[in-house]
């Protein structure tokens, strides 16, 4: 990334807040412009985070209602994540170039329209297409939201309050998506998408009234690079999803592989010659940072795939309702928070590598235990025990990964580096899920099962699905072992991470 692009991303304009000139204080009631701006940015951030998980709980009902096979079922969530993660870096550049308020409002309008189309989808193709549109919109909204928090609110109490709200919406969005998805799916899975429409309209109106346009920084957009990166992942996932059913030498899997490989080669060539590349390759020259990026990619994939498999298992195999399935995830959310809190203390005394291996060991044990489950297993303690242990491990590994990221580049380049890390973490989800799904589908078919809707399965086919999903957990355990191997190359010390933590805290304080 060029120096000019870095400055455009990380040196925000400091507009004076509308309607007052005195130094702001939170001791008095916040002004209307502040409430409107925070509501606009915070609510749409919540929706984009929710939509990464809200469909997970609804998947079995969507599959039964629309008659999807296993491949089609997973594309309902994969389409959103691929578009979101693959185009996120380009979305941030669009805001810098054409104005963040304008880009934000365009993204909100597109997201709201796509949500309505999801709610009224008449078949699987229409739903996947609308989810793809949602992901494109979210890829514009997410980075421009971050920038708008910095440019809309002046340094001091108001910005700190806005950052707190924004961070809270980001943190609870994924968990709320699981819980709210279950409650809404009990009535209709379509409500899980239609709930976005009124909130999207509200955010659009408030943004138009309260947000101010930022200065535009004309720069060459690397559209080709962003599209090629997304195409690489999409073609790979599509080929992997069709291979077990069609045969690996069938035209679609082979063609997808050729397209993915060709797109990867083209992406490397484009990024090496681009004036303003979407992915600066110089960030990958450091071994520590390269290992860190790989760990974020695989770790994000493990967490995402685990949530999908658990949601599928408790509903399709154990027969839980959507609401009961969402409640089953509550201990998971609590355990992640506890693990993160414990990890924040552990990194003061141990190197990130030690903490990461400890958290990964918890995840590995949980998945190995989960792979032994059978249809007759009860939620407590048979399912909740490995679920909580895995969640503790996820919480533990998240903190040293984030702090190591800051230690790898320093605060002066944390903006573009964090953006690439978030992209890799997002794309890891559908990529790891696609590989694990190959194992699940192959095992299910080998045991006499089917890839059709669960409502049409007999007892033998349900047993085959049970064995397939638990076999998939073994593959997921293998992914955790692979992460552990990558982590061995991360050599940051506890002192470096402590310094990064202090620098980040000072920066967040303004």
Briefly describe each language-model feature range.
Residues 2-209, 350, 371:
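Transmembrane-helix bundle of Major Facilitator Superfamily
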Residues 2-3, 164, 185-298, 302, ...:
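Hydrophobic transmembrane-helix bundles of small-molecule transporters
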Residues 34-50, 55-57, 70, 251-259, ...:
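12-transmembrane solute porter fold
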Residues 48, 77-80, 84, 111, ...:
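Structural signature of transmembrane alpha-helices in multi-pass secondary transporters
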Residues 62-63, 94-95, 180-187, 240, ...:
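Interfacial helix-cap and linker-helix signal at transmembrane-aqueous boundaries
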Residues 106, 158-170, 219-228, 253, ...:
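Cytoplasmic-side transmembrane-helix entry/capping segments in multi-pass membrane proteins
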Residues 119-126, 208-211, 240-246, 268-272, ...:
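Transmembrane helix-loop junctions and nearby membrane-interface residues
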Residues 451-469:
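Short, membrane-exposed interhelical loops at transmembrane-helix boundaries
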